[in-house]
UniProtKB/Swiss-Prot annotation:
Intrachain S-S bonds: none
Any one Pfam family match given in the protein's UniProt record, by short name: DUF179
GO cellular component: cytosol
High-level lineage: Bacteria, Pseudomonadati, Pseudomonadota, Gammaproteobacteria, Cellvibrionales
Family statement: Belongs to the UPF0301 (AlgH) family.
Name listed for the protein in its UniProt record: UPF0301 protein Sde_3637
SUPFAM superfamilies found in the cross-reference section: VC0467-like
Domain of life: Bacteria
Organism, as annotated: Saccharophagus degradans (strain 2-40 / ATCC 43961 / DSM 17024)
């Protein structure tokens, strides 16, 4: 699992829309019901980084047919983890062989992006070793791959009503079951996502 360096953070994603740029860092993207993309349908994406050069996020509600125990085995780690049975998430279509850990505790890992007071993103192997040994962050999720947007692409998709946006709530990432996260985020907008059409958006 490679480190997350400054080049990675801005590789394959960057936006500049007309008018004043507004960053959606530490926001959720809630897929509109009409979004038919097989990767992002009914998805909830946490935006980790968003500048005028692009955006990067992790999908937090798409479980794979893979567990943390499988990852530990692939990395030849001794598995003492109480969380070994937890599902690995499909974080997005970019760098799908690479692991990313979203977690609450900041810790002292080799490659951590501090996104919000209670949300961090680490892409170095040391955190996986710690999780395998039950010494990792108390609240975390493990994803393979990430979602990336080039300059202006995310803004265009929001204008096209592909996404709803809302400031992120870390409890949805870490405390709510995977299958409930999409609807839970939408409820914070005061809507029932299951009753929405694809003809209205919120930016």
């Amino acid at each position: 699992m490679a480190t997350l360096d400054s080049n990675d953070k801005h590789d394959n994603h960057a936006p500049e829309a007309a008018g004043e740029f507004v960053s959606l860092r530490d926001h959720f993207l809630i897929a509109m019901p009409g979004l038919q993309d097989p990767i992002f349908s009914r998805s909830l994406t946490y935006i980790c980084d968003h500048t005028a050069q692009g955006a990067m996020g992790i999908v937090v509600n798409q479980p794979m047919n893979l567990t943390l125990g499988d990852i530990f085995e692939q990395l030849e780690l001794q598995d003492k983890a109480q969380q070994a049975g937890r599902a690995v998430l499909a974080g997005g279509p970019v760098n799908t062989e690479r692991g990313f850990v979203l977690h609450r505790d900041s810790g002292a890992w080799e490659s951590t992006m501090h996104i919000a007071p209670d949300v961090n993103l680490t892409a170095s192997r040391d955190i996986v070793h710690a999780i395998a040994n039950n010494t990792g962050p108390k609240s975390s999720l493990f994803a393979l791959g990430y979602a990336g947007w080039s300059a202006g692409q995310l803004e265009e998709e929001i204008s096209a009503n592909s996404w709803l946006t809302i400031p992120a709530d870390s409890s949805i990432i870490f405390d709510i079951p995977v299958e409930d996260r999409w609807a839970a985020a939408a409820r914070q907008l005061g809507i029932d996502i299951h009753l929405m059409s694809a003809t209205a958006g919120h930016a």
